[in-house]
């Protein structure tokens, strides 16, 4: 009887592959939904490491496990399955224990692919023992009688062990290839995620640069506003002084107008006085001529009296003229002097005011030019700020659209991952159900073999008697 050590050696290999199998689940979850649709249950079971794809294909794709076992066991009784009787069926096959690839290989290698004939008719998974016995009898009746080897004393041959080892090496190579594919897919996923992360970082950097430019523009705007406020204050002061000087100029102009009116009045008065003086001179000249004529005439008594009277009148006239002249001089000379002084002062003040106004105009010209330049700069800065805001709004809108696109892609990837996880869970449930069915079939296999041994021995005895009778 062969020991089950080669089969236990496969347990260590299976245990060494279990971490890789567990690590392959995130890779399956991270794949896209399109890739998930190409997976089938058989490939998923091969990725899990418990049942190989070739083993499942070898057992038959058109029927289930029960049909394959019955056809493999009863088509050729000479090549029966080896079962280790030193272990109890409950210990060897548990429902909770995953199916081992080595056990599947031990079941497969007993029957060659050329000897397996898969029935095309569908077979019900739950057959009664009587139906199984009927099929065995029909199969044995169609086959020639062959000697039944003793299953208890026939161990595994060296060729079977070599084939098992080769098959195990193939499984190990397949697992390593799957691990390489998993690493490659993880690397591709990382490479696919890197552009999105770089785009997000670039967007954040652009937003920070836009905020910096905005802050710098605001600082420049505040500085220009402060300069404009200072220039406005200076301009206000200059305007205030200009208005004050203009008021003084108007006052001086009014004084000059008043002085001109006084001058005209004095000129008119002087003309009147000159006319009166001329008239008085004419009258005096006439009287003088008359008196001279009287003097030239022969003197008479009346003439002496007239001469005395004329001398008296002449003296009175001279006294009157002197008094009137002195009165006029006393009355108008101070006013004339004051008017002359005021005229000179007004002329001098007017000249000073005109000089100051000219200086202020010359000083106001660069300020006006500077104010126009500052207004132009202010308009340019406002236009630049408007353009920067528009550009920032456009960039923010573009960044938002890109962010929405990336969020949409992220949602799609998440939905694909969820679909893949759900499919993986379904595959896991299918694998567990297949493993449970396989363990159930393995548990039922010894009983079916025992039931098949009795009809086979009876058929052999009948055939042995038939040649004797002949």
UniProtKB/Swiss-Prot annotation:
InterPro entries: IF_rod_dom, Syncoilin. It holds the Pfam family Filament. Detected strongly in skeletal muscle and heart and weakly in lung (at protein level). Highly expressed in skeletal muscle and lung and weakly in lung and testis. Residues 157-452 form the IF rod domain. GO terms for cellular component: cytoplasm; cytosol; intermediate filament; neuromuscular junction; perinuclear region of cytoplasm; sarcolemma; Z disc. Residues 1-148 are annotated as: Head. Residues 446-470 are annotated as: Tail. Residues 158-192 are annotated as: Coil 1A. Residues 338-445 are annotated as: Coil 2. Disruption phenotype: Displays no obvious abnormalities, have a reduced capacity to generate force during isometric contractions in skeletal muscle. One of its GO terms (biological process) is intermediate filament-based process. It is found in: Cytoplasm, Perinuclear region. This is Syncoilin. The gene is Sync.
């Amino acid at each position: 009887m062969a020991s089950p050590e080669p089969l236990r050696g496969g347990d260590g290999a299976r245990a060494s592959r279990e971490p890789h199998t567990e690590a392959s689940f995130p890779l399956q979850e991270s794949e896209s939904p399109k890739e998930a649709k190409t997976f089938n249950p058989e490939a998923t079971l091969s990725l899990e490491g418990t049942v190989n794809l070739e083993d499942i294909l070898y057992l038959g794709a058109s029927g289930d496990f029960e049909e394959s076992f019955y056809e493999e066991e009863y088509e050729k009784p000479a090549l029966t399955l080896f079962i280790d009787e030193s272990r109890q069926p409950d210990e060897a096959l548990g429902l909770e224990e995953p199916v081992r690839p080595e056990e599947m290989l031990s079941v497969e290698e007993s029957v060659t692919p050329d000897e397996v004939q898969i029935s095309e008719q569908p077979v019900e998974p739950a057959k009664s023992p009587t139906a199984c016995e009927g099929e065995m009898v029909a199969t044995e009746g169609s086959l020639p009688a062959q000697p039944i080897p003793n299953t208890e004393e026939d161990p595994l041959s060296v060729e079977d062990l070599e084939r098992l080892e080769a098959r195990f090496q193939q499984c190990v190579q397949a697992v390593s290839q799957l691990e390489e594919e998993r690493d490659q897919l993880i690397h591709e996923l990382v490479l696919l995620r890197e552009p999105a992360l770089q785009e997000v970082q670039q967007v954040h950097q652009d937003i920070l640069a836009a905020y910096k430019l905005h802050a710098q523009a605001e600082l420049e705007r505040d500085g220009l506003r402060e300069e404009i406020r200072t220039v406005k204050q200076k301009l206000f002061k200059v305007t205030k002084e200009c208005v004050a000087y203009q008021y003084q100029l108007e006052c001086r102009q009014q004084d000059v107008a008043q002085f001109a009116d006084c001058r005209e009045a004095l000129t008119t008065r002087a003309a009147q006085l000159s006319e009166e003086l001329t008239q008085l001179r004419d009258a005096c000249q006439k009287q003088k001529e008359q008196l001279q004529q009287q003097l030239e005439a022969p003197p008479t008594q009346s003439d002496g009296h007239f001469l005395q009277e004329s001398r008296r009148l002449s003296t009175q006239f001279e006294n009157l003229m002197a008094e009137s002249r002195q009165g006029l001089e006393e009355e108008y000379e101070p006013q004339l002097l004051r008017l002359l002084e005021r005229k000179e002062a007004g002329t001098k003040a007017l000249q000073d005011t005109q000089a100051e106004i000219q200086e202020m105009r010359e000083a106001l010209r660069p300020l006006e030019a500077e104010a126009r330049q500052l207004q132009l700069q202010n308009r340019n800065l406002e236009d630049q700020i408007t353009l920067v805001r528009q550009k920032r709004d456009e960039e923010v809108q573009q960044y938002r659209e890109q962010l929405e696109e990336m969020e949409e892609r992220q949602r799609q990837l998440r939905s694909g991952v969820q679909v893949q996880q759900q499919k993986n869970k379904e595959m896991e449930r299918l694998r567990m159900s297949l493993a449970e069915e396989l363990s159930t079939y393995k548990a039922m296999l010894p009983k079916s073999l025992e039931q098949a041994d009795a009809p086979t021995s009876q058929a052999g005895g009948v055939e042995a008697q038939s040649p004797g009778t002949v």
